[in-house]
Amino acid sequence: MEYQYPLDYDWSNEEMVTMVKFYEAIEKAYEKGIIREELMGLYRRFKEIVPSKAEEKKIDKEFQEVSGYSIYRAIQRAKEIEEQKLVKM
């Protein structure tokens, strides 16, 4: 990783750890693939931390600028496939 993840310093340490795990899961979806349930579980936790659609879009844009990976596209792909399948971008 040669870049910094978008983090909000108002988040608790636990929330920051969760967000980093979520960003890593998105990277994994693009680089190797990740089991759908693992990604969706982290996405549900992400939505607890970032419930606002506007904030979600802002974070996705910031993450895509630094990593080249789209949170939105990865989650859309995960929603399209069957359970226990690999999400691979």
From Swiss-Prot:
It comes from the Bacteria. Coiled coil: none annotated. SUPFAM superfamilies: BH2638-like. It holds the Pfam family UPF0223. Disulfide bonds: none annotated. Belongs to the UPF0223 family. HAMAP family: UPF0223. This is UPF0223 protein BA_4171/GBAA_4171/BAS3873. It comes from Bacillus anthracis.
